[in-house]
């Protein structure tokens, strides 16, 4: 991946984050305690913005701190809340001798403030907003008398175990759901009501700062007990960096894991918080800037990137439209889709092509589908699929071809796909091919077809495959369990062997390709469960086809000036932006129809509004460039 695209947000694994952290401290000279303080401030602000309603008075807060630097972040956060007048309990872990140097220092600071908070000016006694000056909309204290420092308690492992004693109940997820709404009390010897009116064993907020991203083995012993206990508390829950028990590498649950309502991660997205099941444990996800920047990678950028739901997608999503343009200026798509009597997939994919900005569409489908195609999609041209279909002529006409939605796996479908790939390899100008659905199944079952695909990519041709997990398992000739246990590694192996751009569709869709021998990937953050419906993949193949055609036109205008690596990267960007747009369409459709009632056509219905918003963003970016230059616009 060339340089640093400021539209993108990097995804790091534990080692990449460790390297960035180390370079920030050692090379740039940023003190570790400064980074920790910024992390605590960022976490505090994110929590206040998430739950302003619970901070209208004195709040009871629990911070579970480990003995490493994640625990140090937690101790610093505990201090900030304590000095704001809240009652804070810090549950520390292990022996002090095993604390990291930063954690030890943070605990020393915290204890000194705890010992010295009496006798100071009661700056909040008038009930004013204790966070005034931080730009935070937090309710005032409603006249409640709160001293400048709240109550601070530090609990060791032994003290915590003594308080939970033999009455600690560890609930399963099902049991916890069954008891939802009940006030779970596990500190059984502290059930008396405190002067704030809350049970002394209950907390308004619990913060997980036990492990962070360094965890690589299963959680056991007292840590497992702590996480289970934390999960049973009834208040709000926040995690620092990543929920404890979630692998930062692959999102797997290492024995057990903290279930957060909000996760504030520092510097960059952690891979494990974007992949399932880890993503489910994070709740709302936020990245906080604490001073570790992309410059800290020293030119060795991470392999992973993402776009969050607030990112701009205008750069390569839309092709600028000149007033004197014509319909051929914005990409011509050839769609081989549908089988006899089953035109649904072809209609969905075809309409998605046109709604995504392509100038022209030609559909090749069996004769039985002709009447409904012409009636339902009159804007498209139609060609009857037959033994003698002139694929060479059709391929010469288009800028991109989509193969697969609903074509079946019969002899004619397989022969047609073979002819397409053969003709594509013989053409002077290679064109992008999008393979979906039955096109993928045919490729998985035919050595001849898979060989043609490899030959085409070897000569510089672009093939974008869009399998869901079952289709990907067939392509890899492995079982689902084997695929899911090492999803990224399996995807990497496949793209290295085949040379394709691979879109692994799932709840967290991953797009990957090989860049000069290095596996690069994108993890998508848009979309919702309502998109798990028939035809959603056909819509994606249509969006992908339209955007591939637009990219082909854009690259063709450069008259071959782009090198092969740059071309492949351009289509990687095309693929992940199509996935991003597809997910955004799903999110917008869910706002109108709800996730339960959504159907694939709702995604298409959302595209005009979304692309209109992109056009507005592009105009705004153009004005900014005119007045201020390219600063801050990425590419």
Language model segments and positions:
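Small-residue (G/A/S/T)-rich helix-start motifs and N-terminal tracts that mark the onset
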Residues: 2-104, 128, 203, 262, ...
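Intrinsically disordered, low-complexity terminal tails and inter-domain linkers enriched
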Residues: 115-199, 423-430, 449-455, 515-520, ...
């Amino acid at each position: 991946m060339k340089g640093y695209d400021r539209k993108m947000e990097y995804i790091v694994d534990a080692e990449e984050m460790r390297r960035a952290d180390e370079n920030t401290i050692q090379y740039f000279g940023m003190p570790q305690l400064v980074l920790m303080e910024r992390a605590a401030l960022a976490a505090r602000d994110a929590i206040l913005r998430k739950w302003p309603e619970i901070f209208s008075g004195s709040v009871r807060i629990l911070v579970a701190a480990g003995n490493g630097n994640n625990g140090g972040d937690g101790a610093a956060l505990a201090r900030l809340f304590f000095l704001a007048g809240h009652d804070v309990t810090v549950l520390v872990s292990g022996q002090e001798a095993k604390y990291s140097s930063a954690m030890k220092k943070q605990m020393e600071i915290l204890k000194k403030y705890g010992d010295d908070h009496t006798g100071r000016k009661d700056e909040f006694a008038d009930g004013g907003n204790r966070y005034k000056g931080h730009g935070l909309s937090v309710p005032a204290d409603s006249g409640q008398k709160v001293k400048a420092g709240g109550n601070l308690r530090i609990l060791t492992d032994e003290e915590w175990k003594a308080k939970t004693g033999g009455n600690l109940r560890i609930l399963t997820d099902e049991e916890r759901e069954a008891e939802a709404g009940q006030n779970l009390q596990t500190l059984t010897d502290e059930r008396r009501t405190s002067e704030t009116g809350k049970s002394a064993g209950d907390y308004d907020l619990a913060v997980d700062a036990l492990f962070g991203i360094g965890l690589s083995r299963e959680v056991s012993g007292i840590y497992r007990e702590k996480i289970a206990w934390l999960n049973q508390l009834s208040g709000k829950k926040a995690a620092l960096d990543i929920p404890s028990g979630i692998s930062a590498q692959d999102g797997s649950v290492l024995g057990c894991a903290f279930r957060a309502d909000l996760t504030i991660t520092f510097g960059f997205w952690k891979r494990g918080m974007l992949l399932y099941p880890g993503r489910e444990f994070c709740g709302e996800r936020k990245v906080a800037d604490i001073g570790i920047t992309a410059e800290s990678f020293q030119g060795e950028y991470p392999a992973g990137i993402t776009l969050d739901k607030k990112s701009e997608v205008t750069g390569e999503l839309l092709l600028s439209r000149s007033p004197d343009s014509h319909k051929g200026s914005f990409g011509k798509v050839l769609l081989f889709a549908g089988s006899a009597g089953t035109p649904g997939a072809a209609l969905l994919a075809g309409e998605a092509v046109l709604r995504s900005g392509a100038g022209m569409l030609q559909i090749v489908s069996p004769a039985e589908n002709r009447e409904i195609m012409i009636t339902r999609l009159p804007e498209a041209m139609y060609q009857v699929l037959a033994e003698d279909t002139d694929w060479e002529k059709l391929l010469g006409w288009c800028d991109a071809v989509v193969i697969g939605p609903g074509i079946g796996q019969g002899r004619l479908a397989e022969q047609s796909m073979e002819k397409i790939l053969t003709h594509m390899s013989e053409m002077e100008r290679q064109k992008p091919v999008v393979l979906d659905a039955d096109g993928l199944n045919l490729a998985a079952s035919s050595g001849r077809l898979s060989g043609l695909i490899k030959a085409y990519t070897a000569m510089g041709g672009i093939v974008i495959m869009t399998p869901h997990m079952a289709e990907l398992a067939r392509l890899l000739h492995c079982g689902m369990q084997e695929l899911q246990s090492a999803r990224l590694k399996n995807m990497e192996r496949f793209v290295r062997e085949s040379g394709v751009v691979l879109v692994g569709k799932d709840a967290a869709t991953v797009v990957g390709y090989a860049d000069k021998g290095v596996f690069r990937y994108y993890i998508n953050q848009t979309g919702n469960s309502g998109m798990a419906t028939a035809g959603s993949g056909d819509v994606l193949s249509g969006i992908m086809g339209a955007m591939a055609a637009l990219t082909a036109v854009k690259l063709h205008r450069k008259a071959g000036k782009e090198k092969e690596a740059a071309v492949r990267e351009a289509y990687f960007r095309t693929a992940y932006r199509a996935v991003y747009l597809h997910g955004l369409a799903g999110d917008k459709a869910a706002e109108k129809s709800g996730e339960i009632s959504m159907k694939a056509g709702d995604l298409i219905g959302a595209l005009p509004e979304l692309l209109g918003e992109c056009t507005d963003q592009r105009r705004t970016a153009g004005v900014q460039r005119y007045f201020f230059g390219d600063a801050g616009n990425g590419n």
